[in-house]
């Protein structure tokens, strides 16, 4: 069915949502066209794809990953604790808000993570777009990552 959509020029390419690596491989094995993306939940509030192999799988395939809920359903904007403290510190350092730092964290990862933002507010979109101004170095990136993991990275 997905191949048919591409062959009939109804779509240029197809991807999937919430597939684990073995699901992508299983479906891909029965297709003639290439799956080009997988939309998964990944953020500083949903860190599992960094540790369970999902991002590594797509990075190896050179497939961009679409990140749904990249702001943790808003929890990263209103939450407290270690992640919020790191977001606030970096937001102050770069002169942006938490959302820009949270998105910059995803953009800095080499797996090519494409955040899917769920807002229609132009002001909110502008604040999120400030992620392009945030150039996290490795130390800053790992501070956020460790805060999200709740432990130091060896």
Name each region found by the language model.
Residues 1-154:
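Beta/alpha (TIM)-barrel catalytic core signal, keyed to glycine-rich beta->alpha loops juxtaposed to Asp/Glu
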